[in-house]
Amino acid sequence: MQSLVEAIKREGRVLPGGFLKVDGLVNHQLHPALTREMGETFARHFAPLAPTKVLTIEVSGIAPAIMTAAELGVPMVYARKKKPLTMSEQVYTAQSVSRTKGGTVDLFVSSEYLGPQDRVVVIDDFLASGGTLRSLSQIIADSGATLLGLGCVIEKEFEGGRQHLADLNVPIHTLANIVRMSEEEGIVVQAGR
C-alpha cells in the first residue's frame, strides 16, 4: 500500500533496541483516511475467502481490524489482555510474548463470539516474529473455527515471522514491508506482499 509506505518513510523512526516507532500512524494516533484504506485493501484481499469474522488483539490491531470488518460486512472480535468480570466463564485463552510490554500477556476470547461455525481472518498491526499471530491462531483452533488468513499492517521481514507461520498453511498479506532498519541507516520500506 503505497500511501502507507510513504507515511512510514515520512514519520517512522528507529528507536534503540530495534523498535520501530510508528505510533503517529497505527499505535497511538490514527489517520482515518489511511486506516480506512488499510481496511479496504485487506477486505479486497480476503473477501474471496468468505470470512464470517475478523479477529485481532487489543489495542493497536482494533482500528485496521474494524475497518476491514466493516468493508467485509462481518463482526470483529478482539482478544482481551485481561479477562473482565463480565466475560462469560467459557473462554479461549493463549499466551503471547510482547516485546513492547516486556513480558508475556494472556489473551482471552469469549466462546460467545467465536466458534466452529466461524471462518476467521486475523488482522493485526505488526508481523515480526509471529508470536502474537501464532497465539491468535491457537485461540481459533481451540474454538473449532477455521483460520482463513493473516493480515498485518507492517511486516518486519528480517524477524522471520512469515517463515515461522508457514505451517499454518494460510495466506499472509501485509501492507508495508520493513526490509531492514537501523538507527544509522533509518528505515528501508517497500510495499507489502
Curated annotation (Swiss-Prot):
Positions of disulphide bridges: none
Localization (cell): Cytoplasm
Gene Ontology terms: biological process: purine ribonucleoside salvage; xanthine metabolic process; XMP salvage
EC numbers for this chain: 2.4.2.22
Keyword vocabulary terms for this entry: Cytoplasm, Glycosyltransferase, Purine salvage, Transferase
Positions contributing to 5-phospho-alpha-D-ribose 1-diphosphate binding: A128, S129, G130, G131, T132
Top-level taxon: Bacteria
Record-listed xanthine binding positions: L20, N27, K156
GO molecular function list: xanthine phosphoribosyltransferase activity
Keyword flag Cytoplasm: yes
Main location class: cytoplasm
PANTHER family tied to this protein: HYPOXANTHINE/GUANINE PHOSPHORIBOSYLTRANSFERASE (PTHR43864), XANTHINE PHOSPHORIBOSYLTRANSFERASE (PTHR43864:SF1)
HAMAP family: XPRTase
Family note: Belongs to the purine/pyrimidine phosphoribosyltransferase family. Xpt subfamily.
Function: Converts the preformed base xanthine, a product of nucleic acid breakdown, to xanthosine 5'-monophosphate (XMP), so it can be reused for RNA or DNA synthesis.
Name by which UniProt lists this protein: Xanthine phosphoribosyltransferase
Lineage per the UniProt record: Bacteria, Thermotogati, Deinococcota, Deinococci, Deinococcales
